[in-house]
Amino acid sequence: MNSPCDRLQQFIQVLLEESWSFPSFANTLHWPENLLSYIDELVWQGSLQNFHQHEVRFDKPPLRLPLTGFSSLTENWSSRQAVSSRLVATAASPPAGCQAPIAFLGLKFSSLGPARKNPALCFLYDQSNSKCNTSWVKENVGCPWHWCNIHEALIRTEKGSDPMFYVNTSTGGRDGFNGFNLQISDPWDPRWASGVDGGLYEHKTFMYPVAKIRIARTLKTTVTGLSDLASSIQSAEKELTSQLQPAADQAKSSRFSWLTLISEGAQLLQSTGVQNLSHCFLCAALRRPPLVAVPLPTPFNYTINSSTPIPPVPKGQVPLFSDPIRHKFPFCYSTPNASWCNQTRMLTSTPAPPRGYFWCNSTLTKVLNSTGNHTLCLPISLIPGLTLYSQDELSHLLAWTEPRPQNKSKWAIFLPLVLGISLASSLVASGLGKGALTHSIQTSQDLSTHLQLAIEASAESLDSLQRQITTVAQVAAQNRQALDLLMAEKGRTCLFLQEECCYYLNESGVVENSLQTLKKKKSSKRS
């Protein structure tokens, strides 16, 4: 009987022979990224044929999945009489019974310093000579003799060459350095469960290691929790979909996605007169709220009669955009500090017009009954919290590896920063303060109204959206299928740039979400 690995290889080979379009097929079936990493390794070994014609590569380490072995690599070193410890990398093992190798990718050791030289690793478990198993060796993790087994960082250039420790030669990375890769050929051997110690050397000829490393494997059985979590996400998505759709469109199949949020931002940029939007990227961050409250320059002048129902408002907190150019709010209904606002007007009771809100201490409301000096209350409009990059700026970002460079804010343009000025002037010119808040989104006939309808129609809508994003962010590193619930639409997804989901604006300013197009642009930026 064939082993699980053999059957998996046969299954993958059949799929490829049927001429599937792999990018679309992979995203439609939600192939886990550690499986794709495993496929990539099979290709390298020559087990699969004609695979690289699909031009699919994955640079990130395998993701943690339920019911898999989860291995970690820790570095311990001393510097100036201080002992430091750092988790360098993690990797997911295949299911028990399938002895496929795993790899720690892009290892960057803090103890090596900027020189990096030509490092080597020494492990205690694979020493065959008795002189390399003395108490001194075990205490110092030392391999001072040439007959000890030492794994030097090599460049894997041929299929026949399969070193354990080798240089990461993938493109990109700062200064052209992408770290090192460490391959474990037998991840389910019992020794990895108890933990394996080793030494890291700046060069194989050095007597003492610069750091000690430890590799350990644990078995994760989180399938029940992830199943429940996926079910909750799907239920929340169905609830949100029904809230997003107008009554006339309830029968149509539609759902909220990152593309909807990005489209809102692109159309809003165009309708407010922002120029030169072609060949740009709009990005939404998982860890950032989808909407931002932008303060408006003048008070609301809007009245409703007693029979007009007051629409509900989104629950939860919405962050307030702070303009770095103007350090004061243009108008406040109340403030605990007069220096915060250019103008303040005390009110006893007033309603907000359609698509307008009162922002009071991080909470949104449609009716302002009373204010006090201890509360900051502002008239606001909700804007998608997106980041705008040019192609050159995106190229700069793609050239860096994790963590994201600290000076990102010097070139990234936050959408509310652009719209906070242009939107304010356009709203005043279009009738703000004369009985109606004419939001620029309202004038665009071809713009999807889903997001605004959700905000106006149900108090639960924003809460539901935020809950989904928060939930997905928690499992994004564990389950790519859950991430695709919001990011993918029928085999298409965004360009996932570190922690952001990015879409390309073509020559006409239209959002383009073809995965293949974006991956080509990503490749061209890295070359």
Curated annotation (Swiss-Prot):
Which residue intervals make up region (Transmembrane protein)?
412-527
Task: Give a brief account of the tissues where this protein occurs.
Answer: Low expression in skin and testis.
As for subcellular location, the record says:
Virion
UniProt KW keywords: Disulfide bond, ERV, Transposable element, Viral envelope protein, Virion
Q: Where is this motif: CXXC?
A: 280-283
Q: Which cysteines are joined by disulfide bonds?
A: C494-C501
Q: Tell whether Phosphoprotein is among the UniProt keywords.
A: no
Motif stretch (CX6CC) = 494-502
Residue ranges of the region described as Fusion peptide: 412-432
Motif CKS-17 covers 477-493
Q: What is its main location?
A: virion
GO biological process annotation, one example: viral translational frameshifting
- In terms of superkingdom, the source organism counts as Eukaryota
**Residue numbers spanned by region Surface protein:** 1-411
PTMs per UniProt: The CXXC motif is highly conserved across a broad range of retroviral envelope proteins. It is thought to participate in the formation of a labile disulfide bond possibly with the CX6CC motif present in the transmembrane domain.
Site feature location: Ancestral cleavage site = W411, A412
* UniProt record similarity statement: Belongs to the gamma type-C retroviral envelope protein family. HERV class-I F(c)2 env subfamily.
Any extra remark in the record? Orthologs in P.troglodytes (truncated), G.gorilla (truncated).
Record function comment: Retroviral envelope proteins mediate receptor recognition and membrane fusion during early infection. Endogenous envelope proteins may have kept, lost or modified their original function during evolution. This endogenous envelope protein has lost its original fusogenic properties.
Its domain description in UniProt is: The CKS-17 immunosuppressive domain is present in many retroviral envelope proteins. As a synthetic peptide, it inhibits immune function in vitro and in vivo.
Please give the name of this protein. Answer: Endogenous retrovirus group FC1 member 1 Env polyprotein
Its ancestry begins with:
Eukaryota, Metazoa, Chordata, Craniata, Vertebrata
